[in-house]
Regions:
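Long, contiguous binding/interaction regions
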Residues: 1-60, 64, 68-97
Length: 97
């Protein structure tokens, strides 16, 4: 049974917008892999200054996704997010919807 989750992540800032778009598309593909999840909304917050430096980065590109995900697919999704060089930080929480 799928549950509603909110995924917020910070993409490493890059002057080339295609790199950011590729990272967002990759995360969406991870969520939807094996039909374990479905992205319902993507909200791009844009470039923001970080509160503190992460991996020598002062700025990041914030993205928030709403998704319906089967809990059995969460470990693989979190593993991919942790191992991605483009994702600085992420937060995955159960939505209150």
């Amino acid at each position: 049974m799928k549950k509603a989750y909110e995924l917020t992540f910070i993409v490493r800032q890059d002057p080339n917008e295609d790199v950011i778009n590729d990272a967002v598309n990759q995360v969406q593909a991870w969520v939807e892999a094996g039909e374990l999840g479905q992205v319902t909304k993507i909200d791009r917050w844009g470039r923001r200054r970080l509160a503190y430096e992460i991996d020598k980065q002062r700025d990041g590109y914030y993205v928030q996704m709403d998704a319906e995900i089967d809990p059995s697919g969460l470990p693989e999704l979190e593993r991919n997010l942790k191992l991605s060089a483009q994702i600085l930080r992420y937060l995955l929480v159960l939505s209150e919807k």
